[in-house]
């Protein structure tokens, strides 16, 4: 996830009472509020479950930010209505936004890393091994180097 703006060039420019859009689905809402805490815009309840953070967990909001939680996929189309928006990499990609224009990015949380999983009885199936082989192939590594553009976190063994 990253912070983007059509109005400001820095996260340091945040005005008092800024309007900020964040995703309204539970996992991405939590990710974005954690990112906004990381950049110093808010403070969150230290006892809150990091995977389930909501607006109710904000304990300090020194910039008096007005948050609007909305469908992630609609955020890019409404950027002009907000001072800043917080959006995930997949939404950035789908909207054709240049990921390098992010003013801030989240720290990757280990529990959010996506994985391909199969039932135990399928782990040695030819199709499952084909996925593993493709994922670890030089072609995939090269493709990700060329096409990642900062949108996705890539494990070190694939870089």
Describe each region flagged by the PLM:
Residues 13, 31-68:
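Ligand-binding cleft/hinge of the Venus flytrap
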Residues 1-11, 112-127:
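A bilobed periplasmic-binding-protein/Venus flytrap-type ligand-binding module shared by bacterial periplasmic
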Residues 1-42, 141:
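A conserved helix-loop-strand patch within extracytoplasmic ligand-binding domains
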Residues 18, 41, 62-66, 80-87:
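Alpha-to-beta junction loops
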Residues 68, 83-84, 98-110:
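Short beta-strand->loop
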Residues 75-99:
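A ligand-binding cleft/hinge motif common to bilobed small-molecule-binding domains
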């Amino acid at each position: 996830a990253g912070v983007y703006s059509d109005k400001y060039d820095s996260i340091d420019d945040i005005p008092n009472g800024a309007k900020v859009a964040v995703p309204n689905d539970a996992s991405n809402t939590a990710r974005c509020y954690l990112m906004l805490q990381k950049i110093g815009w808010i403070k969150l309840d230290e006892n809150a479950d990091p995977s389930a953070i909501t607006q109710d967990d904000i304990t300090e909001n020194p910039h008096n930010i007005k948050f609007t939680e909305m469908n992630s996929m609609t955020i890019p189309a409404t950027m002009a209505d907000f001072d800043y928006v917080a959006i995930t990499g997949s939404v950035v990609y789908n909207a054709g936004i240049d990921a390098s224009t992010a003013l801030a990015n989240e720290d990757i949380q280990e529990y959010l890393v996506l994985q391909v999983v199969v039932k135990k009885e399928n782990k040695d199936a030819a199709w499952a091994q084909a996925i593993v082989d493709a994922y670890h192939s030089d072609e995939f590594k090269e493709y990700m180097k060329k096409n990642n553009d900062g949108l996705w976190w890539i494990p070190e063994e694939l870089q």
